[in-house]
Amino acid sequence: MAEMHDQGTIKAVCVSPSKGTEKTNIHRALLKENWGIEGDAHAGTWHRQVSLLSWQKVQEFNLLGACVCDGAFGENLLVDGIDCARLPIGTKLRCGDVLLEVTQIGKECHHGCAIQQRVGTCIMPHEGIFARVLHGGTVQEGDEIRIVRQE
């Protein structure tokens, strides 16, 4: 099991114009408060504005013989150094000016998911997390992301 760290690094910033598809790494994006990532199909006034996935989990998946790129599982932010799936709901993450709050761990993969059809399986249902944007700003590859510990 991966060691839990309080901080990590953004490895990719990905968006897609439609839901249920792979995302494309755009390297930098504007996150809007209570909306999500500008230009992403999942943005909106709901609890799954931004999806996050641990980079290490994608690397483990690739070691099994897959060859997936950033955004292949529909994740918005690919994070190195934090085991996203182990973060409890309500955890806050800071990346520069951006403040996110974890709202959901995992998801149900809908039948006929384009990602599952292409890749063969999807790790988002058990490794991905979702968050809402409490404070907006710009996020880019290489930015530090850290868990905000409550006093």
Per-region residue spans from a language model:
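Metal-cofactor-dependent catalytic cores
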Residues: 1-151
